[in-house]
Amino acid sequence: MVSALRGAPLIRVHSSPVSSPSVSGPRRLVSCLSSQSSALSQSGGGSTSAAGIEARSRALRRRWCPAGIMLLALVCLLSCLLPSSEAKLYGRCELARVLHDFGLDGYRGYSLADWVCLAYFTSGFNAAALDYEADGSTNNGIFQINSRRWCSNLTPNVPNVCRMYCSDLLNPNLKDTVICAMKITQEPQGLGYWEAWRHHCQGKDLTEWVDGCDF
């Protein structure tokens, strides 16, 4: 058996360049993969004998997919297996209602308009906004809360004051985001923690941010 296996030819992937992707790409992928399955079933199936291994080896060598097609198949598979972040882009009044229901209107002396203004100038109302700083930290969620102090990216020796993962701040229901934002505003600087609020919202007439919104 061992000598028979040693004599079996190796399976090689063609190294010829793959043409640019086109509309026919997915059909080629399905055809390529199905042809391999057909080749296997026609050439010994699941046989573990030396003859069966030899037959499958020859069939795969004849019908082996180009490297680019196999890479495309792998990417498609990973995209199905990996969890996707559900992005949520809020409308102005929609966000105002959610933050109002969470009790942010008047919290620590800040109006609901302060919070809506902050959300616009930090994330554009995008609950799944994620931004990377030069030091490797991340700004997360609709208020762009930073990972250096407030949440955990599994980086050692980070305070994680909000006691949550940074990925929790990307949740579209905003519950964890609001909890963490409340902790931040309990600090002496309050909403001044956010540079965007200091530059665009502090001391300004913010009535337009909640104008026409029903609660």
UniProtKB/Swiss-Prot annotation:
Q: Which residues does the entry place in the Cytoplasmic compartment?
A: 1-63
- In which tissues has expression of this protein been reported? The processed form is expressed in sperm (at protein level). Expressed in testis, epididymis and placenta.
User: Which PROSITE patterns is this protein grouped with?
Assistant: GLYCOSYL_HYDROL_F22_1, GLYCOSYL_HYDROL_F22_2
List residue numbers at the site (Cleavage). 87-88
SMART domains given in the database record: LYZ1
Keywords for the protein's UniProt record, in alphabetical order: Cytoplasmic vesicle, Disulfide bond, Membrane, Secreted, Signal-anchor, Transmembrane, Transmembrane helix
Please describe the post-translational modifications of this protein: The processed form derives from the membrane form by proteolytic processing.
Output the Pfam families linked to this UniProt entry.
Answer: Lys
Provide Extracellular-side residue ranges.
85-215
List the InterPro entries.
Glyco_hydro_22, Glyco_hydro_22_CS, Glyco_hydro_22_lys, Lysozyme-like_dom_sf
Q: List the disulfide bonds.
A: 93-213, 117-201, 151-166, 162-180
Q: Which residues form the C-type lysozyme domain?
A: 88-215
Its domain of life reads: Eukaryota
> Which segments cross the bilayer?
64-84
> One Gene Ontology cellular component annotation?
secretory granule
Q: Which GO terms describe its biological process?
A: fusion of sperm to egg plasma membrane involved in single fertilization; monocyte activation; positive regulation of macrophage activation; positive regulation of phagocytosis; sperm-egg recognition
- Quaternary structure and interacting proteins, as annotated: Interacts with ASTL.
Summarizing the function annotation, the protein's role is: Sperm surface membrane protein that may be involved in sperm-egg plasma membrane adhesion and fusion during fertilization. It could be a potential receptor for the egg oligosaccharide residue N-acetylglucosamine, which is present in the extracellular matrix over the egg plasma membrane. The processed form has no detectable bacteriolytic activity in vitro.
Similarity section: Belongs to the glycosyl hydrolase 22 family.
Q: What is this protein called?
A: Sperm acrosome membrane-associated protein 3
Gene responsible for this protein: SPACA3
